[in-house]
Amino acid sequence: MDLKTKLYQMFILGTDGNGYKEALKNGLGGMIFFTKDIHTQKQFRELVSEIKSEALIKPFLSIDQEGGRVERTENIHNGKKYLSAKFAFEKGEIFLEKQTLEIANELKSYGLNLNFAPCIDVNTNPNNPIIGERAFSNNVEDVIKGEKIVSQTYRENGIIPCVKHFPGHGDANADSHLTLPEIDLPLDEMEKTHIRPFEACAKNIEMVMVAHLHCTCFEKENIPTSLSKKAISYLRNKLGFNGIAISDDMVMKGVAMQGNTPSEVCEKGIRAGLNMFIYRNSLPETIEIIETIAQKATVDKELKQNIEKSFELISSLKQSML
């Protein structure tokens, strides 16, 4: 398989722009779906089926389906609403497992295989504008317990779980969709609280989403953890994570302004150790990012090695779970 196809495997794109159709034929790694893509159950199943048939390589077919305010299929539920992580957890372990099984079965019925959940941030800041009830709790042990139930239930029922948002978004006071939040806590404090749930699942979890956060314990400069070699190396070397490190959405302002061009930002992510990238669109400029990096990687040994390494991880997970 050529280098360009391996690079395409590192990207999960959305439907906006329709560039995904050609990208699938070039080896695109996966697709992500939002509420705007989902109108009826029949229509959505047909969309997913069409994408599968067009793909050169089996794709990750993904969604953010946490429950509560992050629920993409609510328009086709016939009035049913899943509870957010906080309220589901408060109803007890049996309820949490049952709801997770319902979500897994629903996602499978549409042909999906990857859910960007659970959210294992420890919600220590009550004024956090982006996490809140998406977190199981503000208690570390509760978050660890919730993660284990949800991830295991997804895994046992054919859905790949992805924990988020490393190294922990719970103390943030800003929304990374709009800006780059800063968490100014020493590493030992981060380890006791926000990093602890990631440490607890690191050796078992298939995928970790890395946040667009500036954590001063990793980088003094204004660099998000998603582009921080120190942060991603810590995840692997200190916590023992051997799976896929994936970015949060790369069009979020917390990361998008980190380079002169979008391809430069993405290249920084590859060099930092990210294995996959989410772009909520497949506009021509997003496809251009892949093409630009592919061209550069042919003459850049480090970039090429990182792409090869990522491809091995992606292939391994696909072979075992898809």
Feature locations, PLM:
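A charged helix-plus-loop insertion that forms the helical arch/lid used to bind
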Residues: 77-92, 135-137
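Glycine-rich, aromatic-flanked loop segments that form ligand/cofactor-binding clefts
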Residues: 54-80, 96-123, 143-167
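Short, acidic/polar
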Residues: 14-26, 95-106, 190-198, 258-268
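Second-shell residues forming the walls of enzyme active-site clefts
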Residues: 36-52, 59, 69-71, 145-155, ...
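Divalent metal-dependent hydrolysis catalytic cores, especially in the metallo-beta-lactamase
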Residues: 28-35, 113-119, 273-277
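Glycine-rich anion/phosphate-binding loops
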Residues: 39-46, 88-105, 138-145, 188-192
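Mid-to-C-terminal alpha-helical segments outside catalytic/metal-binding sites
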Residues: 292-322
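N-terminal hydrophobic targeting/anchoring segments and the immediately downstream early-domain regions
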Residues: 1-77
